[in-house]
Amino acid sequence: MDDQLNKDVASMREVLDQDLATSQPRMPEQPLLVAMCGLPGTGKSYFAAKLTEQVPFLILETDRLRKVLVEHPKYTTGEHRRVFRSCYQLIQYYLINGYSVLFDATNLNEEFRAYLYDIAEATGARLAVVHATAPQNTVRRRLKERKADRHANTFSDAGWLIYTRLAPVEEPVQRDHYKLDTSKDIAPVLDQVVEWARSSGQIKVD
């Protein structure tokens, strides 16, 4: 790793190691990797929070970790790659050390998701991809409400402008995955992912 990457990983790990004391995301048989993907405002973090209420995971949330590295994020391509590069290193590190990880990020195209596929294969971790979507009018309303609420429980600064900039680059998930429309009741998909996790990833993702 180069010096900048080493520094970034160390800064992020300092934050994440503090989380381990409370989340205790070790699994009885083998670690699991859940990868959220979807545009800003589609409810990824809400789903992740609900999932970890039932199954212990260490959450790597890029919106949170981005601010560990960059005080005022600009969401540029270079910044994006810097954050994700460190996250990939940390995901692999925690999986190798027996922790189950939930990666809460946009993961909009197969180029970025391919890193996660490779990490899961290299570490032997079972992988579940959850693709979150919502109608544009729903997302726009959520982002507007989030911007207006200074006390909103979120690390994300992404607004409608960021959404419209990212939407054209989103690609379909090429592997079996869970399809989550957060404008509807999330309970059925949540139950499926919980069941998958409790089976140590033995249940087929569909």
Regions found by a protein language model. Give the residues of each.
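Extreme N-terminal, non-catalytic leader segments
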Residues: 1-31
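Hydrophobic anchor at the beta1->P-loop junction of P-loop NTPases
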Residues: 36
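The conserved Walker
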Residues: 40
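Conserved glycine(s) of the Walker
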Residues: 43
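Conserved substrate/cofactor phosphate-moiety recognition/catalytic segment
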Residues: 46-99
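Glycine-rich phosphate-binding loop used to anchor ATP phosphates in small-molecule kinases
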Residues: 81-127
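Conserved phosphate-donor/acceptor-positioning beta-strand/loop module used by diverse small-molecule
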Residues: 123-143
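Small-molecule kinase domains that catalyze NTP-dependent phosphoryl transfer to phosphate-bearing small molecules
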Residues: 148-192, 204-206
